[in-house]
Amino acid sequence: MRISALLWVPLLACSPDTQDEPPALPQEAPAVRPIHFVEVAASVGLAWRHDNGMSPQRHFPETMGGGGAFFDYDGDGDPDVYAVNGGPIVADPASEVPVNALFHNDDGHFTKVNAGLSHPGIGMGVAAADYDLDGDLDLYLTNFGPNTLLRNDSGTFADIGAAAGVDDGNWGTSCAFADYDLDGDLDLYVANYVAYDPQAAGAERIPYIANYESHRGQAPPSYPHPDSFSGQSDLLYRNDNGEGFVDVSAAARIEAGGKGLGVAFADYDRDGWPDIYVANDAVRNSLYRNNQDGTFRETAALAGVGYGLDGQMEAGMGVDWGDYDADGLLDLTVTNFQAEPNALYNRDGTFFSPATFDAGVGLPSLPLLAFGTQFFDPDLDGDLDLFAANGHVLDNVGLIDQSTSYGQRNLLLRNDGGRFTDVSAAAGPGFDLQRVSRGSAVGDYDTDGDPDLLVFNSGQPLSLLRNDSGHGNHWITVRLAGADGNPNGIGARVTAYSGDLVQTRELRGSRSYLSQSQLHVSLGLGHRSQLDGIEVRWPSGRIERFGPFAAGQVLVLIEGRGISAQPSP
């Protein structure tokens, strides 16, 4: 793979409204080829199995984890893998404690390393960012129990959660970094779930299967329903110049309560300030619109993204933003429980409109229970396709509902002009698997230009789905280096022009469910062999344009400086 060292060409002015768009060039499109994924985890060194700590007591956290990350911890250009482990909720002191695992990527093969990341605990989620501006990616981990911040010092990590003020002891789930106040450093949002006490034996709990009875007249054992517990409040931490964090949740008007599972930042209203969406379980979802003064206004119901199609609260799990209909506006997807379709909300200006069934997402997702989700472009045709990681929360669900199963196939929906088609059955052996999937992440682990999938399965081996589509489509990958405290350009908006194709992407790593994707922007060009131009709106507000570029390379765009030459990974 080549990393571009071409001259950069910043175009005039700073407003996209004042620029002439590159002319559309007529091209003949080739026939559509299948998307093809192959499971390769064990063969490339990722033979790792998640421990969910499943017990006869069926403690609630056993069924909700876990996640992980594609992130480049050593700065060599290859995305490494971090897997978050679970373990027994009530541990036997004589038993070995499960730990998280870090795998170093060396040209597409992984080796397990320690580096100070073998963290014990009932792990849930992870987010990666260079919060202290020392040039390498740090990790924040959520747990059922105290969370922690792992500071990266040239490839070796140290636990500084307590010292940094972010060791909250609630049940943390998804988390994400972004510069919400635009002060030049990356802040942190942590979703919290419910107040579950494993020692509260005999407490009245609402089971998921309360309305079902076995042939013997009794309901089989069940994990509790989230309605059994009160929600815990999410947390917003302001970064204090890389020295630590301050809890500003109340001052920023983050609502108390909630049952947060998925979180993703995005500037959905295009005002230059990051907003926050939280997928909540069995209560209204939250959309926090940034007031540009350090506070937020909760607007989910008003904007049309707080409830399901029938106005009912749903079991929100994972979340992602993406411009699936190529109108320049970020749309929203949220995964839900079985018999609740995964939601697709189309941004149509001021509000969102439900597009779940009109766009083809509803019916394929109805029989499945989904957690992780990604907008991504595996066939590199320029349209954002949609992935969902599926698996039931009840290990014995087949006893009371023979239409479903604990392990489920994952879902791949192919986008053709804003309409999705279920292509899972034809997407290769990687989609033949039936697993209990939870978190998911996207990254190009083998550096061949197309996105691969990393899926974390509860109590099972993780899955690495290599993209072997062989479609022959062209691509460009964009890595960003922001100034003023945001070295990876998290939150930057990229608009790419290639003939008649215009793509809008926003760089963020933490999304989906409990997981972190590779910090780059993957652009599929289809049959087009050139990218005519790229516009980057940096979190600082600066707007720059670059190009043109030949396809098939990685561009490293540095705010205010242009393109940097780097060695090939």
Annotate each predicted stretch with a short phrase:
Residues S4-A13:
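Bacterial N-terminal signal peptides
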Residues C14-T18:
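Bacterial signal peptide processing site
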Residues P26-V38, D92-V113, P146-I160, A201-E204, ...:
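Beta-propeller blade repeat segments, especially FG-GAP/WD-type strand-to-loop junctions
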Residues R33-H36, V44, M54, G360-L366, ...:
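Gly/Ser/Thr/Pro-enriched helix-cap/hinge segments flanking short amphipathic alpha-helices
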Residues L46-G67, E96, G116-A127, G165-A176, ...:
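Repeat-based blade/solenoid architectures
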Residues G65-G75, G123-L133, L137, R151, ...:
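Beta-propeller blade termini
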Residues P79-N85, D136-N143, L188-N192, D275-N280, ...:
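Hydrophobic beta-strand segments that make up the repeating blades of beta-propeller
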Residues V84-V97, V194-S228, A389-S405:
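Short, conserved, GDST-rich strand-edge loop motifs in beta-rich repeat architectures
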